[in-house]
Amino acid sequence: MIGFSARMQSTRFVKQLKYLGRLGYLAQALIFSLMTVGVVNAEESHFARFERGLATFDPGGKYITQALERQVPGLNVSGTLSHWSDFLLSGEENIGFRDRDFDVLQMQTLLEVALSYRFSTNLELTSISHFLYDSAYDMGGNDGLYADKIDDSFRYYRDFERVARELYLSYRTSAVDLVVGKQQVAWGKMDGQFIDVINAMDFRESVQLEASDYETRRLPMWMANGTYYFKDVSLNVLWIPDFVANVNPGYGTPWSSPLLPPDDTTVRHSDLWLKGRVNVAGDKILQTDKPHWQNISDHQMAVRLDAAAGALTWGLVYYYAWERDAAPFVVGRFSDISGDHLVLEPRYERLHHFGATADYAWVATGVPGVGNLPIVFRAEALYTRDAQFVDYRNLGEVRAGGEGDGVSEHDTLRAALAFEFAFPDKISVIFQPSFYYTDDWHEGLGTGFGGAIGDRWNFAPVFFISRPVHGTRDRLKTSLTLTPYFSGPNRGYQGSKTKLMVSYEFSPFINGSFIYTDYSGGNDDDLFGQYHQWDNVGFELKYEF
């Protein structure tokens, strides 16, 4: 009876999430349709009335936030209803190992509810809950989308770990901040996660993921987070008993790499493949042993020191952490009717991260054609000791009877500089050259934490420019991001990613965006080159209350 009740509750919960997904999608379509009709067909007076009505459209604030805060003194309530839809521009076809019979990359609706209760001036309890549903997995005939069979969180959130996103108690004074509970910590400011490494990440969007997504895609952990403020120096210490691994775009996800064997037909009908117990060589893969909070030796620890001297701020970081992705170590051999095979044990190994960051702001005067030009310079770097890489060269030797475990350790470095310019007419320009390096790299080496992809080094000079349209009172904004990817000594150019975004502030509560993303250049086995048929357009709508 209890099991039947639980199934009924689960069924109702899924139906509610489906309804939430459809609601977000319809709301998005309605708002964009109304805006289009208003701009193109309606008289100015009609559009003005529509805008005035939309400016005060805040049912969540009126009927939820304000009502609850009146009933419970000391309670603060806020929320966000967001919807993202991304559609492929190329036709349905098999690409590499992928059965790409779908044309929707995501159709996600996310409801975020944030509650905070202030016990006193210094003491506050905060809860942030996430309710997500991705309708892309409901599309009929999509044999290529089956990741929800492996992990249902790709489709919707229903367990405590995902729904209870953050839950912490904070005590703050002018000299001390102490936050205990489940939380995310953002140490970096740049696109590329250079020192932003405290939390694992949900990488379901693969190369489409950008800095604007980090707040939503980080995976919070249970920890104690304390900061002490001196006059011009602050010391931040993290004690983290918890461990969370990365979520990667594996089999059956829209962004599963076309280079990842075997084909989808093999995987989606095999429990061994769905559970990750076998590979294309027929090897046996054991259960992954994760760090556990009950073992003090498994806990993680991080320290950050920041200092300020006028317009210059700088910081040093150290993080004694675990790998976010397990490396498959060879631990045995066996034979069957198909031949000799290996026994692999995925393990998370310890890492030592050493990082540095700096910011400097100034105004360049007398710039020709510009006048005064505000500039911000940023730098971030992370050096990682003993990152684990799958070593396919050694793995081949082991298969031939040689020694080794198929994994090798390499130090890695990733660093970036950013130059931010605030030109007249509110034009913002950012140039961010980014660099990734794997020490002692050789042919046949896979990927590892912080290292280059497919080569010894990678170089990605990111260029960003944005400008508002003044005729819309700066409510309409356009931006362009260009990310070419170079590497050496072998691959050279690995392709480029181009992102064009047009956003509009419908009201103080509602924002919408249209996004075009293009992947071009490089070879079919390169970082961006493999996704050259994943060009897409996206629509985003966000309502905050």
Residue spans of the language-model regions?
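Residues that define the transmembrane beta-barrel architecture of outer-membrane proteins
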Residues: 73, 87, 103-111, 160-165, ...
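Outer membrane beta-barrel
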Residues: 122-265, 310, 516-517, 521
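N-terminal periplasmic/intermembrane-space "pro-region" immediately following the signal or transit peptide
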Residues: 2-4, 8, 17, 34-128, ...
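Repeated loop/turn-to-beta-strand initiation elements of outer-membrane beta-barrel proteins
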Residues: 75, 123-125, 175-178, 232-235, ...
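Residues on the lipid-exposed face of transmembrane beta-strands in outer-membrane beta-barrel proteins
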Residues: 111-117, 127, 166-171, 224-228, ...
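Detector for outer-membrane/organellar transmembrane beta-barrel domains
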Residues: 104-106, 321, 359-486
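Transmembrane beta-strands of outer-membrane beta-barrel pores
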Residues: 83-89, 131-135, 173, 184-186, ...
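Outer-membrane beta-barrel "beta-signal"
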Residues: 206, 531-545
